[in-house]
Amino acid sequence: MYRFQCDYTEGAHPAIMQRMVETNMEQTDGYGLDPYCDSARQKIKDLCECQDADVHFLVGGTQTNTTVISAALRPYQGAVAAVSGHINVHETGAIEATGHKVLPLPSGDGKISAVQVDEMCHAHFTDGSQEHMVQPGMVYISHPTENGTLYTKKELMDLYEVCKKYDMLLFLDGARLGYGLMAETNDIALTDLAKYTDVFYIGGTKVGALFGEAVVITNEALKKDFRYMIKQNGGMLAKGRLLGVQFDTLFTDDLYFKISAHADQLAMKLKKAFQKKGYGLRYDSYTNQQFPILPDSHIEKLKEKYVFEFWEKVSDAESAVRFCTSWATKPEVVEELIRDIEAC
């Protein structure tokens, strides 16, 4: 059996494991105050062309989202997100557990628009009973989205502009950011994220690291005392250098971008194979996540050799499923899967 159900079925890229072993017996300061975290921070700042950014390393995505959102919002504020957004459907109420409501907006493809946000905020701030309701205080988006779709630079800029209009923060979840940045249709760069968000993070857990997410803060107000929030939310790793070593390695010789491109290229081969067979696609994704609509009988046949994720029923006889490639996916296995798709 070969697993395509997610992009974190393996451990870490061999270069990271090698560097972890090489540095294992070194003595360093803890809590992210070591030379490896310093080096990784500087590399990220250079790539973002933003020397004033603050960079912090946390362990996982949900922990990162709860820490950022709880640091950014007042007690009476909530986070605006797509109804399918990770914080709304896949984090077990973690945001709500901090006392902040998720304010969902409808979305067919995983994205939300500046127009939607503007309409929601206008309705709130012109309501005579506004102080009786949760105030929108932040917009949360992800790139790629849960559905593998991508924001354009124009869409990002428009969202940032409407956030400034209503004095809100824009937070971009980058758990799969590498796969978004390297997608053939993507026009957003790290430099754009530094300009047109208040805070974003660069995912490591799903892009070659054993664990870890790198939070990049450009908003001055959010920078203050952020390490206190990390500690309070259980995110300050005593052996913080384990995060620094990993991100320092990922951003040496463009490794992060190379392994992300590898996953996207293999995903595009799968996408073309599904289309050639005549299968529809639930979402038009150019990232490492693909969502073909298959006859249920074909799904059962493919499940004999591969593990992939059920997404939703489309008809009585068809379902959408998700296939994920990753930095570790073997090209020869993708070729074998393509042959099996053709044989269905």
Model-found features: residue ranges?
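Conserved N-terminal alpha-helix of the aminotransferase class I/II PLP-enzyme fold
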Residues: 13-61, 83-88, 94
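Conserved PLP-anchoring active-site segment centered on the Schiff-base-forming lysine
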Residues: 71-89, 118
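Conserved C-terminal alpha-helix-loop-beta "cap" of PLP-dependent enzymes
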Residues: 74-78, 268-342
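PLP-dependent aminotransferase-class I/II
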Residues: 99-144, 151-158
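Hydrophobic beta-strand scaffold residues
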Residues: 102-103, 170-172, 281
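Active-site C-terminal subdomain of aminotransferase-like
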Residues: 108, 135-137, 142, 150, ...
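Catalytic PLP-binding core of fold-type I/II PLP enzymes
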Residues: 151-183
